[in-house]
Curated annotation (Swiss-Prot):
Entry's Gene Ontology molecular function annotations: hydroxymethylbilane synthase activity
Pathway: Porphyrin-containing compound metabolism; protoporphyrin-IX biosynthesis; coproporphyrinogen-III from 5-aminolevulinate: step 2/4
GO annotation, cellular component aspect: cytoplasm
Enzyme class name: transferase
Family indicated by similarity: Belongs to the HMBS family.
Name of the gene this protein is made from: hemC
Name of the protein in question: Porphobilinogen deaminase
SUPFAM superfamilies associated with the record: Periplasmic binding protein-like II, Porphobilinogen deaminase (hydroxymethylbilane synthase), C-terminal domain
Keyword terms of this UniProt record: Porphyrin biosynthesis, Transferase
Species annotation: Pseudomonas putida (strain GB-1)
Modified residues (S-(dipyrrolylmethanemethyl)cysteine): 242
Enzyme Commission number, as recorded: 2.5.1.61
The keyword Transferase is assigned to this record: yes
HAMAP family per the UniProt record, alphabetical: Porphobil_deam
C-alpha cells in the first residue's frame, strides 16, 4: 500500500477535536510514515446554541458539513460521536470503522449533591436530552429539568455559576477531556439507559475508497461494532434521530447480544421498555425485533407527539 495523506474532517469542539486526534494517533501508530492532518469545520449544530436540539431538527445536525467535505474531496474521513450519526448516509458514503467504546453511561455532575437520589425536591437539573429528561422525571417527578446546551466546558461553567443544582452529561466526554474528577457519580444503565452508540467513535468515508478502508481496519473494534449495529437498527426502525426520547443499549454475553430499548414521554409519565437476546451475527435483526416490541406497546404515538412539538416530521 502506498504511503499517503489522510485528511480528517472534524467539528471544532474540544470533544470532536479529541476524537479526531485519537483517530490520528491510532492511524499513525498502525501505519508509520502515514501523514494525517485535521480539517476542522463548524456544523449547524455548533452554530445554533440558543434552542433545544429537538426543535432545530436533530438528524444530521452535527455531521452534514463533514459529509459535504467528504463528497467534495476536501477530506478523506470524518470522525463522529456515534450517537450523533444519522441512520442513513448520503450516496457514496458509509460507516467503515467503529472504535472501541468508552464508558457508555450518563454522569451526574454536581458541586453540592452526591447523587441523583440526594437532590432535594424542586432541584434544577440541566440536560439537553429528551431521553435523559424522560428517564429522570420518571424516577424523580419532583425535579425541574432545564434546557442546557453548549460544549462540555460551557455546561460545567453554567453549573459552577449556580444556574443548576446538577447537570447530566455523557461520562465518555468528561473522561476524554480530562474532566473525570468532575463526575460526582455515574448513573447505571438500569437507571438511565444510554443513547444508541453513546461512548463510541465512528469513522465515515467514501464507499469507493478501498485504500482508506484498509487503513482504517486496525482501528475497528468488532465487539463494539456489533453492539452499536443492534442499537442503531432499533433507532432506525423507530425513525429516531439523536434528539428524541429513545434509549437503547446492547451488551455482549459470550456470542449473544442482549439489547434493551426504551421510549419515553419527555414528561416521564410513560416509559416503554423492551429487551431481547440474539446471536451477535443477528445484531440488526435484534434491533428491529426490540423496536417492534416498543411499537406494539405504543411507541409511535409518543414519538409522533414529540416530533409534533418540535415542529418537524
Amino acid at each position: 500500500m502506498s504511503t499517503r495523506e489522510i485528511r480528517i474532517a472534524t467539528r471544532k469542539s474540544a470533544l470532536a477535536l479529541w476524537q479526531a486526534e485519537y483517530v490520528k494517533a491510532r492511524l499513525e501508530q498502525a501505519h508509520p510514515g502515514l501523514l494525517v492532518t485535521l480539517v476542522p469545520m463548524v456544523s449547524r449544530g455548533d452554530k445554533l446554541l440558543d434552542a433545544p436540539l429537538a426543535k432545530i431538527g436533530g438528524k444530521g445536525l452535527f455531521v452534514k458539513e463533514l459529509e459535504t467535505a467528504l463528497l467534495d474531496n476536501e477530506a478523506d474521513i470524518a470522525v463522529h460521536s456515534m450517537k450523533d450519526v444519522p441512520m442513513d448516509f448520503p450516496e457514496g458514503l458509509g460507516l467503515y470503522c467503529i472504535c472501541e467504546r468508552e464508558d457508555p453511561r450518563d454522569a451526574f455532575v454536581s458541586n453540592t449533591f452526591d447523587s441523583l437520589e440526594a437532590l432535594p425536591a424542586g432541584s434544577i437539573v440541566g440536560t439537553s436530552s429528551l431521553r435523559r429528561q424522560a428517564q429522570l422525571l420518571a424516577r424523580r417527578p419532583d425535579l425541574q429539568i432545564r434546557f442546557l446546551r453548549g460544549n462540555v466546558n460551557t455546561r460545567l461553567a453554567k453549573l459552577d455559576a449556580g444556574e443548576y443544582d446538577a447537570i447530566i452529561l455523557a461520562a465518555a466526554g468528561l473522561i476524554r477531556l480530562g474532566f473525570e474528577d468532575r463526575i460526582t457519580s455515574t448513573i447505571s444503565v438500569d437507571d438511565s439507559l444510554p443513547a444508541g452508540g453513546q461512548g463510541a467513535v465512528g469513522i465515515e468515508c467514501r464507499s469507493a475508497d478501498v485504500e482508506i478502508h484498509a487503513l482504517l481496519a486496525p482501528l475497528h473494534h468488532a465487539d463494539t461494532a456489533d453492539r452499536v449495529v443492534a442499537e442503531r437498527a432499533l433507532n432506525k426502525h423507530l425513525n429516531g434521530g439523536c434528539q428524541v426520547p429513545i434509549a437503547c443499549y446492547a451488551v455482549l454475553e459470550g456470542d449473544q447480544l442482549w439489547l434493551r430499548g426504551l421510549v419515553g414521554q419527555p414528561s416521564g409519565g410513560t416509559l416503554l421498555v423492551a429487551d431481547a437476546r440474539a446471536p451477535r451475527t443477528a445484531a440488526e435483526t435484534l434491533g428491529v425485533q426490540v423496536a417492534e416490541d416498543l411499537l406494539s406497546q405504543g411507541a409511535e404515538a409518543i414519538l409522533k407527539e414529540v416530533y409534533g412539538e418540535a415542529g418537524h416530521p
